[in-house]
Amino acid sequence: MNTMTLTPGQLSLSQLYDIWRHPVQLRLDASAIDGINASVACVNDIVAEGRTAYGINTGFGLLAQTRIADEDLQNLQRSLVLSHAAGVGDPLDDAMVRLIMVLKINSLARGFSGIRLSVIEALIALVNAGVYPLIPAKGSVGASGDLAPLAHLSLTLLGEGKARWQGEWLPAQTALKKAGLEPVALAAKEGLALLNGTQASTAFALRGLFEAQELFASAVVCGALTTEAVLGSRRPFDARIHAARGQQGQIDVARLFRHLLTDTSAIAESHHHCHKVQDPYSLRCQPQVMGACLTQLRQTKEVLLAEANAVSDNPLVFADAGEVISGGNFHAEPVAMVADNLALAIAEIGALSERRIALMMDKHMSQLPPFLVKNGGVNSGFMIAQVTAAALASENKALAHPHSVDSLPTSANQEDHVSMAPAAGRRLWEMAANTRGIIAVEWLAACQGIDLREGLTSSPLLEQARQTLRERVAHYTQDRFFAPDIECATALLAQGALQRLVPDFM
């Protein structure tokens, strides 16, 4: 199991990926402790001095003007968690819950939240013991933070709700006991600190980014394979073309294609007396389209990495000045906007792949047998596989509709503009699955196309990509049950079978 020392505010993208993919043993770096304790001392001083501060000794939202008596402060925080745990939908899987929990720990441990070290350590203990709170997927609008999902997370700390331990759903109290843990009682400010934040939105979008990176790399490899299958030109990837435009994403994608499409292969040699002048856009413009997608991936990485290390609580405790200040760091608009842009990129990656599949089906464009199979008529070949790809590409066009432009007022109009970041991030998962299915069909089709170029082979890297598939999926000599082959190729893509052939591009 991976062991990680958490220095608050310094998580890397590779660490976040590892947390999502694998269970982790966390340890909080000792450098964080003084800041955590100072923020708690500041909260305690406010209570002791009888000062009024939002979230410490007041109600919440529209009830912020209601002063809460000192003897009710602990009950205030518990009631907040219970009342806000109002999510609906299927439970998030363990990987997503783990990522949300670590993001929450990372934010709280920055020392601006007024939450005791013991509560942060209780969250760390949940992660280390593999106790995963039941968090419904839906119910947050991404401002004031992800209240419902984080309330469900926090229920387990109190011994309320349900949690999964060793694959079994249990009452939280039972799960804690089996893991050797105890519930905690929350002090002033702590319930609000746990609930306020963009951690669910950020985790949702991070998963979308991780999947988009795999899809991008796989699509570049399959795009290169298709270029070979239809004997497309290498000339559009010439570095001079892309340097003249100056778009960095485009320049870098063209470099990836040159890495994959070497000049020393049988297919490359076949171009020496080629009569073609220009290829269709789905081949020729791959650097331009995929370069624009890469730019969106990089922008998403920048914003999400900042948000993963951010303090998105409210109010914030500035212990050095003895102040508690209300603001709006809980508003997940940055996450929503990059998730929307990432959705466009995922949709375009899939759309371009589908067009290349369609190109291979057309004997006039590809100079290959219709639908990539001999004895057409008796055999239908890839005819309906392309239809499946078209259906998935069409679904993604609807799913790519932006969420950040939508807003519904909540909390009696106190919270009158919200981000819809959770929905913006969550739909990326379905889009990624759709695009992976499209790329799987292209991989199958491109390898079939190269097979049909009898005697011609591609570059070493692309032959490796073809061999990886052929070890699991045979060449099509006649029609057979097609769906298992798509499923197999899809599973290989999800395992990173093609991603490892592409140098780091982020």
From Swiss-Prot:
<dbReference type="InterPro" id="IPR022313">
    <property type="entry name" value="Phe/His_NH3-lyase_AS"/>
</dbReference>
<dbReference type="GO" id="GO:0019557">
    <property type="term" value="P:L-histidine catabolic process to glutamate and formate"/>
</dbReference>
<comment type="pathway">
    <text>Amino-acid degradation; L-histidine degradation into L-glutamate; N-formimidoyl-L-glutamate from L-histidine: step 1/3.</text>
</comment>
<dbReference type="InterPro" id="IPR008948">
    <property type="entry name" value="L-Aspartase-like"/>
</dbReference>
<protein>
    <recommendedName>
        <fullName>Histidine ammonia-lyase</fullName>
        <ecNumber>4.3.1.3</ecNumber>
    </recommendedName>
</protein>
<keyword id="KW-0369">Histidine metabolism</keyword>
<dbReference type="InterPro" id="IPR005921">
    <property type="entry name" value="HutH"/>
</dbReference>
<comment type="similarity">
    <text>Belongs to the PAL/histidase family.</text>
</comment>
<dbReference type="InterPro" id="IPR024083">
    <property type="entry name" value="Fumarase/histidase_N"/>
</dbReference>
<dbReference type="GO" id="GO:0019556">
    <property type="term" value="P:L-histidine catabolic process to glutamate and formamide"/>
</dbReference>
<dbReference type="GO" id="GO:0005737">
    <property type="term" value="C:cytoplasm"/>
</dbReference>
<dbReference type="InterPro" id="IPR001106">
    <property type="entry name" value="Aromatic_Lyase"/>
</dbReference>
<feature type="cross-link" description="5-imidazolinone (Ala-Gly)">
    <location>
        <begin position="143"/>
        <end position="145"/>
    </location>
</feature>
<keyword id="KW-0456">Lyase</keyword>
<dbReference type="Pfam" id="PF00221">
    <property type="entry name" value="Lyase_aromatic"/>
</dbReference>
<feature type="modified residue" description="2,3-didehydroalanine (Ser)">
    <location>
        <position position="144"/>
    </location>
</feature>
<keyword id="KW-0963">Cytoplasm</keyword>
<dbReference type="GO" id="GO:0004397">
    <property type="term" value="F:histidine ammonia-lyase activity"/>
</dbReference>
